[in-house]
């Protein structure tokens, strides 16, 4: 009889299937033989009943009219998720949760009460800098009313996180730096023997079937993929950089949905730089991953100047097609570039460093063919078929 693997992801949407919270349930089913399920409110109403062996359990969000003015309203909205968990906890062998958080605590608490022998796996989706900042707030003495209330809020969150840790059987961290820092304790709670370094990966079951273009076949394309215009993705830095560069025979493709706040910025940018309209192309969101992979396959260079990332899955996908990656110094930058061996790490928000590196690419100062070969060799470390075996070894 197959074991059941359930991932709770309240706002899961179709495009997330290619991300870690979609890939892990898929590969747990395809490679390890689990009966995988994802429990969600299907907020965008875009999910099938089944995808690659993963069953989507879609429940209605309760009290949707409530705003999140208090923490209890968030819990109230999850009523139907809690209801499903209460009814089915005994039949769930492995419960996968995202983030060490107060919300994860309540899922874990209910699950362990009803199925004490069940296995809880928390994928941290972890940003070390954010954790250190939050923990400093919790640990320090407030110097103002504002700091007092902020500490009170963070302390309430961390009190539940501390109670979550003992219930958890396994916590994985995406970057080696985060893993080394967190492997023995979380907020002072012992985690020895229950942590794992597990980077995010790429869907090699699909990508390995695609003929990757040779370095010579690729086009002079610089690519970025993500939620364009959000504060995290720092798209404005990329555009401000590009207007300072002679792109020559290169083009830049920006793939992804555009944040509403960024639309006017984009329009003004092209009004002020009309010569770049044919050089810088916004494609819009591409939900069909096979279509998205065509862009990776055409491109030589992938750039992601984010202000923060827990990992940056799109960079690993780009590497699977031999792209030279230029990334800001976010959490997993060293893991992805093999400590700058196959890619370039620039300072966050540094237009000067980004200009310099892109100019080196365009002037052929960087041997992209050599980087291409090294990248394709290194990226095998991020195949999900390999990563899932590593995870499976730790789940009893």
What role is predicted for each listed range?
Residues 8-26, 97-101, 230-233:
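A short, glycine/small-residue-rich beta-strand->loop->alpha-helix junction that serves as a flexible
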Residues 110-114, 140-171:
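Membrane-proximal helix-turn-helix segments that form the acceptor-binding/catalytic region
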Residues 307:
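Aromatic "clamp/platform" in nucleotide-sugar-dependent glycosyltransferases that forms part
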Residues 266-286:
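Nucleotide-activated donor-binding/catalytic signature segment of Leloir-type glycosyltransferases, i.e.
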Residues 44, 154-194, 202-204:
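A short, active-site helix/loop in glycosyltransferases that binds the activated sugar's phosphate group
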Residues 293-299:
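Short alpha-helical donor nucleotide-sugar binding micro-motif in glycosyltransferases
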Residues 339-340, 344-352, 360-366:
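Conserved acidic donor-binding segment of nucleotide-sugar-dependent glycosyltransferases
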Residues 324-327:
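Short hydrophobic beta-strand element within catalytic cores of glycosyltransferases
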């Amino acid at each position: 009889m197959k074991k059941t693997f359930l991932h709770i992801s309240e706002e899961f949407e179709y495009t997330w299937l290619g991300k870690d919270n979609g890939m892990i349930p898929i590969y747990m089913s395809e490679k390890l033989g689990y009966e995988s399920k994802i429990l969600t409110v299907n907020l965008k109403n875009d999910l099938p009943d089944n995808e690659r062996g993963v069953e989507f359990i879609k429940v209605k969000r309760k009290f949707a009219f409530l705003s999140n003015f208090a923490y209890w309203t968030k819990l109230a909205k999850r009523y139907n998720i809690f209801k499903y968990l209460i009814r089915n906890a005994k039949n769930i062998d492995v419960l996968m949760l995202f983030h060490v958080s107060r919300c994860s605590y309540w899922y874990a608490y209910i699950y362990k009460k009803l199925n004490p022998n069940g296995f809880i796996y928390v994928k941290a989706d972890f940003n070390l800098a954010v954790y250190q900042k939050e923990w400093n707030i919790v640990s320090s003495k407030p110097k103002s009313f504002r700091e007092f209330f902020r500490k009170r809020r963070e302390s309430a969150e961390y009190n539940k996180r501390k109670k979550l840790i003992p219930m958890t059987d396994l916590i994985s961290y995406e970057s080696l730096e985060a893993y080394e820092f967190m492997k023995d304790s979380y907020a002072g709670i012992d985690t020895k023997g229950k942590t794992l370094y597990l980077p995010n990966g790429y869907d090699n079951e699909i990508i390995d079937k695609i003929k990757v273009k040779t370095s010579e076949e690729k086009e002079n394309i610089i690519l970025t993929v993500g939620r364009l215009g959000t504060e995290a993705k720092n798209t404005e830095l990329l555009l401000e950089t590009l207007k300072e560069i002679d792109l020559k025979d290169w083009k830049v493709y920006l793939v992804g949905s555009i944040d509403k706040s960024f639309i006017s910025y984009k329009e003004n940018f092209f009004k002020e730089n009309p010569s770049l309209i044919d050089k810088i192309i916004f494609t819009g969101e591409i939900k069909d991953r096979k279509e998205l992979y065509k862009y990776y396959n055409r491109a030589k260079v992938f750039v992601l100047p984010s202000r923060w990332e827990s990992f940056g899955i799109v960079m690993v996908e780009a590497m699977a097609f031999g792209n030279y990656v230029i990334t800001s110094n976010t959490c997993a930058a060293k893991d992805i570039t093999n400590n700058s061996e196959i890619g370039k790490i620039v300072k966050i928000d540094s237009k000067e460093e980004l200009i310099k590196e892109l100019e080196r690419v365009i002037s052929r100062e960087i041997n992209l063919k050599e980087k291409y070969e090294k990248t394709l060799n290194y990226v095998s470390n991020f195949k999900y078929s390999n990563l899932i075996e590593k995870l499976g070894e730790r789940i009893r």
